[in-house]
Amino acid sequence: MRQLCIICVLLLSPFIGLTGCISEAKRDRMVSDEKGKYNLYIVGDDIIDNKLEKETDINNIFRMIIESDYKNSKNNTPYLKITENKPNYFVFDSKDLVYQTTSYKNLVKYLKEHPNAK
């Protein structure tokens, strides 16, 4: 029985150590599943998907997660700096957060100037 416990500890130790190395953004599935495309996490701008489609020709977005509730978003993503009463835009590549802004114009500018995510 003791040997079984030792074997279990030895087998589980690397797994437990590796989960500590995964960024919070990866655990929350904020990062893009597709290299070369971005995931957007938007707080406080419910109509951004329509704006992006109508106003731009940006096609480097894999997924958009839109949250209208500031309190809920702060609780779910405490590692992000969310400014209340303003739209918040967070851009993730396949590894981590690469850009954040409270300006829609700056978001569009960033996406146009950086068409290929890493």
Model-flagged regions — what are they?
Residues 1-7:
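Positively charged n-region of N-terminal signal peptides that target proteins for export
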Residues 69-78:
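N-terminal post-signal-peptidase region of extra-cytosolic proteins
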Residues 22-24:
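Bacterial signal peptide processing site
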